[in-house]
Amino acid sequence: MGRPRKDETTQDVRERLIVAMADRLIREPASAVTVTSLIKEVGCNRSTFYYYFADTEQLAEAALDAVVPVEIPRALLSLIRQGAFSLSPATPNIPDLVQRNAQGIDTLCAVLNGPNAALAQKRVKRRLLEDVLPDLGVSLSSNTDDPTSRIVFEYATGGLLALMAYRAETGFAYPVETFLHCLAPEVPAALLDVLSEKR
């Protein structure tokens, strides 16, 4: 596959394709999105598209990966290691991370409330399984492959993804901080207790 045209910078075109796909995922089924419509919207040629992505399915995965705020759970795990676990917005750095990831969080909420909810749930869980769950095992000195860890993980992520979809359903009537205040620290602490007691 040939390289993109000289006037199409690598980072710029790839990012524009990802942003365009993320917007499409909010409004229409991923299966309905075509390469032709995407390259017309972004203003690149077909060769450029295939230089970066094998197909629209791979682009959809990249678009979802781009809006998963993995920095936030990683920061929370860091607090676990320090013995100061909290989901409260008053916790140092957490408000900054929420603000920094605000656009991506809003996009993910909207996708989870749209025609690609199942696709988004599957991809987000996979990212968290790969990037966050292993760190949780290290923090708690536990085996993340055991049934208890997976059950708690599925329960926690399923609930959070449902809340994100609900936030979009309300027309984004509530800021992320409202959900954090409501859940913390009791809910995450209770789940951590389950993992600690049954590992």
Mark where each language-model region is.
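Short, basic, alpha-helical segments at the C-terminal edge of helix-turn-helix-like DNA-binding modules
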Residues: 34-35, 63-76
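Solvent-exposed, amphipathic alpha-helical segments
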Residues: 16, 20-28, 70, 74-78, ...
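Basic, helix-initiating cap at the start of DNA-binding domains
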Residues: 1-32, 36-40
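C-terminal peripheral helix-coil segments that are non-catalytic and often amphipathic
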Residues: 134-138, 150, 169-199
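Helix-turn-helix
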Residues: 24-58, 62
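Conserved acidic
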Residues: 5, 9, 13, 116, ...
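Hydrophobic alpha-helical connector segments
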Residues: 75-107
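Amphipathic alpha-helical packing segments from all-alpha helical-bundle domains
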Residues: 114-142, 147-162, 185
